[in-house]
């Protein structure tokens, strides 16, 4: 209940005052036109966002007592401010003679709620296996969660004709989203086309995948062969991995994971010596990653048909651990190479209902795999790979005016995954009926879906419902966005399938005001729920969820929080 939450932490008053001042005059705000007329048209756009958030749930002791979840769970208490973040993005675009140009954008952020101190369970035993032995975050973790910046888009383009055929060329760092999927980033045609920012996804449930894409260096060409047929091709010059909240932060799903932590923490006790963490064994930047697409819209189809072929290195890592011969080891990330995808999409509109379908077949893609190969002195560089079929269907419906709302939208999407075969390293596949699927309480027994083991078939759904009320005040539109992602049946076989495991609930509910179509103010609640394993008492540590905690990132189960966001552009 909100009424019993003691709110700690305050808004930076200068930032809030500035945001309110901008809101007051935002009706006249325009992008800065640096040069227009003649051959060049150059524009500078700036977006500023302020986000505040507070933890609303009490700590679940079975999470706080878990050696792999304690640091993230003890970073903030109920009522604490978990984010107090100012972020800005600047975009510079220039167009020469309306057919040639460039785009450059960058982002900078600072979160005043975070310091660099690592916190954990006050039980003295937990201080012996910190994922940051120095007691402070690594530079990598501080960059993404305290203060940092990055270049986003950086590309040039040229539009021309070859004979009578329009040709569009682009080179540099940018994003391109193929297919029709809205929400499911691990099972869509665009999987691994670009890395996905799951830091943003966890803090903004209901975001569309294309909004979460991170740019990647590439060259791309598209041509309109006929009014009904176009073709595109892209070749990548850079590899980038999916971005997740780092271990030991509020929404970090596992204390020792990803590129931030420097120690394997409690794994040291299992491996008989110190365990390092944070290293990534990435594919080469230029590794023959490419894609081709044909878009066809014949009159008889009543819509658009897409055909796709892609070869890529998976951007979703395996979390893996090496056991050294002399004791100790290493926790790291490694990636599947040269996966292939064949896909077909179709989209069609029926009045106010827009529908989309995707069917894709992925070969030698990364599957849910064991954390360790169990072999002393043998490096673990590749988990299980296999062939999977993914089907996505969705619809976007524009709400008609009713006594309850003026307009709005409803988006619904279904994702189905079928494992066709395990192609390599079947002994490492963490799937029901395979050797690496073990019971959470007794590792001598075979495991099940409840233990996080993948199943042959899996189904998940996602919804976004946002009714709108127009002109509730001068220049103000109001909406109430609500989202839900739910794991209906089974655990997907692909790596990170646990995010959509059976029983998963990722949800948000809120209210948003749009002021003169330039500024938004949103207040929402975000929650997460995965099925947990049985509780077990660990001597010296207390009672916690057994094994890895359940069938997904259960460390987030007690991380429900209220979020206030103010965003404007000029």
PLM region descriptions:
Residues 40, 70-72, 80-88, 147-152, ...:
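Residues that define the transmembrane beta-barrel architecture of outer-membrane proteins
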Residues 518, 554-570:
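Outer-membrane beta-barrel "beta-signal"
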Residues 72-78, 138-143, 203-207, 249, ...:
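Extracellular loop and loop/strand-boundary signature of outer-membrane beta-barrel proteins
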């Amino acid at each position: 209940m909100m009424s019993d939450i003691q709110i700690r932490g305050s808004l930076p008053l200068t930032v809030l005052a500035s945001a309110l001042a901008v809101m007051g005059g935002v009706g006249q705000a325009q992008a800065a036109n640096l040069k227009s007329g003649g051959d060049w048209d150059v524009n500078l756009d700036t977006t500023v966002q302020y986000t505040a958030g507070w933890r609303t749930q009490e700590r679940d002791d079975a999470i706080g007592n878990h050696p792999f979840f304690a640091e993230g769970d003890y970073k903030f208490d109920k009522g604490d401010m978990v984010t107090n973040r100012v972020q800005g993005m600047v975009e510079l675009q220039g167009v020469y003679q309306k057919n040639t140009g460039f785009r450059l954008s960058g982002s900078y952020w600072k979160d005043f709620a975070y310091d660099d101190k690592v916190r954990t369970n006050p039980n003295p035993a937990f201080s012996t296996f910190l994922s940051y032995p120095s007691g402070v975050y690594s530079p990598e973790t501080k960059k993404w969660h305290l203060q940092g910046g990055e270049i986003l888009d950086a590309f040039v383009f040229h539009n021309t004709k070859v004979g009578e055929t329009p040709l569009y060329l682009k080179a540099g760092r940018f994003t391109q989203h193929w297919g029709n999927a809205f929400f499911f980033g691990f099972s869509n045609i665009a999987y691994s086309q670009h890395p996905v920012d799951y830091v943003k996804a966890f803090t903004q449930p209901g975001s569309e995948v294309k909004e979460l894409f991170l740019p990647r260096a590439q060259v791309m060409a598209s041509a309109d062969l006929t009014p009904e047929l176009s073709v595109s091709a892209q070749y990548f010059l850079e590899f980038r991995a999916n971005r997740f909240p780092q271990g030991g932060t509020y929404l970090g799903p596992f204390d020792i994971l990803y590129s931030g932590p420097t120690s394997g923490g409690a794994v040291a006790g299992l491996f008989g010596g110190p365990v390092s963490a944070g290293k990534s064994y990435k594919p080469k930047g230029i590794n023959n990653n490419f894609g081709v697409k044909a878009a066809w819209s014949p009159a008889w189809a009543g819509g658009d048909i897409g055909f796709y072929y892609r070869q890529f290195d998976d951007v979703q890592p395996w979390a893996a651990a090496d056991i050294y011969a002399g004791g100790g080891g290493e926790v790291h990330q490694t990636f599947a190479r040269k996966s292939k995808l064949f896909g077909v999409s179709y989209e069609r509109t029926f009045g106010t209902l827009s529908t989309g379908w995707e069917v894709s077949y992925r070969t030698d893609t990364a599957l849910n795999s064991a954390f360790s190969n169990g072999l002393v002195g043998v490096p673990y560089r590749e988990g299980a790979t296999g062939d999977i079929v993914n089907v996505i269907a969705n619809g976007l419906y524009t709400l008609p005016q009713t006594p309850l709302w003026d307009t709005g939208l409803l988006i619904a999407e279904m994702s189905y995954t079928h494992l066709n075969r395990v192609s390599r390293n079947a002994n490492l596949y963490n799937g029901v009926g395979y050797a690496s699927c073990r019971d959470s309480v007794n590792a001598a027994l075979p495991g099940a879906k409840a233990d996080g083991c993948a199943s042959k078939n899996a189904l998940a759904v996602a919804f976004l419902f946002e009714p709108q009320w127009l002109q509730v005040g001068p220049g103000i539109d109001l909406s109430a966005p609500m989202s839900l992602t739910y794991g209906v049946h089974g655990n997907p076989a692909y790596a990170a399938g646990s995010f959509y495991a059976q029983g998963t609930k990722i949800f948000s509910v809120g209210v948003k005001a749009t002021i003169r179509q330039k500024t938004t103010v949103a207040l929402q609640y975000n929650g997460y729920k995965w099925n947990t394993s049985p509780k077990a008492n660990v001597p010296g540590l207390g009672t916690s969820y057994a094994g890895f905690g359940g069938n997904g990132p259960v460390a987030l189960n007690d991380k429900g929080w209220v979020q206030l966001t103010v965003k404007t552009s000029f």
